[in-house]
Amino acid sequence: MATKQHQDAPTPTRPKSTNGIINGTKASVGDPRVVVIIYGQGQERIVAVFADVLGKPYRLAARFSEVRGDDQGTVVGIAVGDAKADILSRNRVLLVTINAHCVALGMPPDVDLSAASDYEFLYTESPFFRRDLSRFIAFTLGQISHHEELTTKPRTYFISTTFPDVRTALSNLDILSVGSDAVEIRVDLLREPLPDGSFNPVPSLSYVGEQVMLLRQRTELPIIFTTRCTRENGKFPMDNPELFYQYLYRAIQWGCEYVDVEIWLPEEIRHRLFEQRGNSRIISAFHDFSGTFKWASPQAQTIFDESRKYGDIVKMITIINSVSENYELEYFRSQIKANNPEGPPLSAVNMGQLGQLSRSLNTVFSPITHPLLPIVAAPGQMSAAEINEALSTMGQLPKKNIYAIGSFRSSPQVTFFEKCFNELGLPHNFTSVDRSGVRGSIESFCHQPGFGGAYLSPALPANQPYIPILSDAARTIGTIDTVVVRGEGASASFIGDNATWKGIRATLTRDFAPSAYQDRAAIILSHSPEDAAPIIFALRSLNIGKMYSAGFKAPGPLAVGVEPFTSIESLQRVDHPFAIISALPSGKSHLVHPLLRHFSSTSRRSTPTIERKGSGGKGKVFLDLANGPRQSDPLAVAEQHGWTAYGVADTSAFTTVETLRLLIGQNVPYSFVRLASGPGLY
């Protein structure tokens, strides 16, 4: 089975995903094709897990020709041995094929099936592997996308793992990735050991695939897949461009969010990868180490024009000989931005110590390092903290006072935010203020010199006269939990936003793709419409179906599609709710127990059994937002009755991630929030 003959046909263009973007735009339905899972010997249960994550039924088939249009909305599993018979003749318009391979079996995946499939999911049956599966399948099917959200950020960064084996980095990855919006795996720096004690000159696809799998298991950040050649400070040989294609195309199949493609590669290969990129994004990369490249020359514009042909982001990296060339780059950057308002965005820096100014001024995917990394990926690379300190020195990052105003213990809050600010090298002060002790209104804080924003707990009503601008989420939900400052001095404006709903949605999609919620029923319990509003908004962003309320009346526009429980009879009309979310006070949280028992699922298991057909999609989610001492543990009750259960600590940590993005414009991963906050904060 020749590799090239089944790689030339591009994956059909996926629908544009909007799940990641701000202001509550609904999750994309994604790729409408029938999902076919190729499974290994004895691994049939992976089909049921895929179905559960997607919220769909499943069945097993003997060959691709048995899968027809009436399988729409069903996950179909085909065994490895059977799939080989007719995978090349499958209907690509009707089917999207994923080769699911368990690396714990001790053998690499079938090379021909890997190349012939649309995507490949490598996994180990670890306790949380379905979270990796959820992220993988939601991304590859176009239900989520990070790129649209990242393009709206004022600054984005990525960190490169320069380890010969990513296992070395995993223990420190929570700290390494603070401030990063993506993590790069440098495939050319990987060293695959051979039985004789030497190393493979080029790491095999199976070894690289496992390294990508390990990285995905330990970070929620998008992955940038890079194979740097010898001429561009890398180790991949340049004598075989088709070798680059094989690895870069496989990165798309593995669901890497970004794929770095060097522009020296033949145009035919770059064009092929761009057409086949699916939901991945191509970084079209140019590097010059000669020292002769000039930003003011016509060559610079020519390289940009060539790069943009097959790139979602253009990256240009050069060596310079004088500090003045940094200013030439800034002029070039301004011209590109002015002449290309629709993009693609330009990431451009000068290498070496002389070029560090350009690293501070670049705003698109600036490559950063960290003191814990063994080597820097390029000369002159800086950490996120060093860039922020440089920006502060230049007056581009003025010192601000950021507040937490509410009813919470100040000591853990201040300590945690100080950890974040120190790790990021930010000059800001953070103060926690008990609202009950505040003299005057919150407005007085907003008008203080150096006010840099605040987050509020409990949230404020959205109709505050001193906060004239509201996000769509805050306006619809009716409350503000974050005050964001845009601009400086007299021209500064205050924007009211709501981060809580994003924390709720992030929690709900940890183990399930957004499609699992589509048109399904949900039950919400709350004593307050204000507490229920962000829950309703989050569920609606996931295309939820009917919502049932208990203990509150849904406010305003959020009331559409929400039916209150008024009697036992109304409860009995609810058929298999997919989610139950309780915002009851901790002293009342036990009231949800009867619902959890009544709607218990006996088919929901951590390791589903497999039959020729299965209902799938019967997974159920319970989220308890109560904070404080309880009479009993509703999470334990939920898990005993087959629910996937989450507590307020999960949602609070995800909400903190979103709050920090709003207040300081930088990314602090969920894993670091949980690590650094300790038991005293949540």
Predicted feature locations:
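Catalytic alpha/beta core domains of metabolic enzymes, predominantly
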Residues: V67-R92, W264-N401
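Short, conserved loop/helix-junction motifs that constitute active-site signature segments
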Residues: D86-N91, R216, F274-R277, A516-Y517, ...
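Adenosine-phosphate binding glycine-rich loop
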Residues: A513, G616-Y682
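Rossmann-like adenosine-cofactor binding region
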Residues: G561-Y646
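Phosphate/diphosphate ligand-binding glycine-rich loop within oxidoreductases
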Residues: K400-A513, P629-V637
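Glycine-rich adenosine-cofactor-binding loop
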Residues: I38-R45, N401-R409, A492-K502, L508-G556
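Catalytic beta/alpha-barrel core
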Residues: G81, T162, A182-L190, P201, ...
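Alpha/beta catalytic barrel-like cores
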Residues: A2-I223, T227-N233, M238, Y247-Q253, ...
